């Protein structure tokens, strides 16, 4: 990642700095002859979560800085639509129980505390919207939720299974 003084960045959890995992502002960059740019020492100001705390500073290697703003990109095989017109018709209705199948396993915690891995799940649609041309649905199941694209939904489900 190319960084400039004054930019916002996130420090990777892999860093051993006290700024690891935090949002920071780049204060200065120390470049030395013979040292790779990625190994340059960067002074950062840790941005406090409450916005009021006294500023703290830390030092990290440039290779541990990540973009603070992530851009979602639709995965291959996900259908996209043209959103230039007003009003989008969603195939699956709000409040309905549906069954979806994810392309890879995800986990959820059962009532007894066990972690279970699955690809298929039933749940209720609680929200729907279009983002970057992809129709997305918020599906609630077993006390948690998952945002899924329309192509994962297979059919309406019996409410007993949701």
UniProtKB/Swiss-Prot annotation:
Assembly notes: Monomer. Homodimer.
Name of this protein: Transcription regulatory protein motB
Keywords of the record: Transcription, Transcription regulation
Source organism of the structure: Enterobacteria phage T4
Domain of life according to the entry: Viruses
Function: Compacts the host nucleoid. Probably dysregulates hundreds of host genes including derepression of most of the H-NS regulon. Plays a role in the transcriptional regulation of middle promoters.
GO molecular function: double-stranded DNA binding; single-stranded DNA binding
InterPro entries, sorted: Tscrpt_reg_MotB (IPR020230)
